[in-house]
Amino acid sequence: VVPGYPANKPEQPVIRVSYNDAMEYCKILSQKTGLNITLPTEAQWEWACRGGSDEDFWFGNLNADFGKKDNLADVTTNKFAVSGVDPQPMSPESPWYKYYTFLPKAANVDDGSLVQVGGKKYEANPFGLYCMHGNVAEWTRSDYVPYPYKENPKKVSEYKVVRGGSYIERPKYSTAYSRKGFY
């Protein structure tokens, strides 16, 4: 019996890491390598994500088919409608199906992934980076303050900017410019 969906396989991205833990990991890597390693700023992250594009995604606009490009909410999320102990997709004929397929999604796309995956399942952007849109959200070291903000704002936020969206978010929340605040 599988106790749930896989989330910690070696090829999957690290999840459920606090901002402080991510920064501590960067500090350890810096000490081991002699390089100055840190999380990117919000601007650095967006530049890397775009891969030279000025569109919503590195591969096109909001209506672009992301199926081979990135892991976002799509028809595969219907498989979250499960029954039994071993999570098996619920049949669409089940009277309960409509109550378990409520997640907003891009109904015309199937990227083939239910949860977060190793990046190389999808195409890399022109800079060679995988899954910058969707899959898992990524910390930046920027404070979450309203736009436009100054280079060194006086008010510091306890929230940090995360970018990239996740496997369960619709495309409009995973664009190169979408941002959220977490602490």
Annotated model-derived regions:
Residues V2-K180:
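Functional-site microenvironments in short loops/helix caps that host divalent-cation chemistry
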Residues Y183:
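Histidine-anchored, small-residue-rich loop motif
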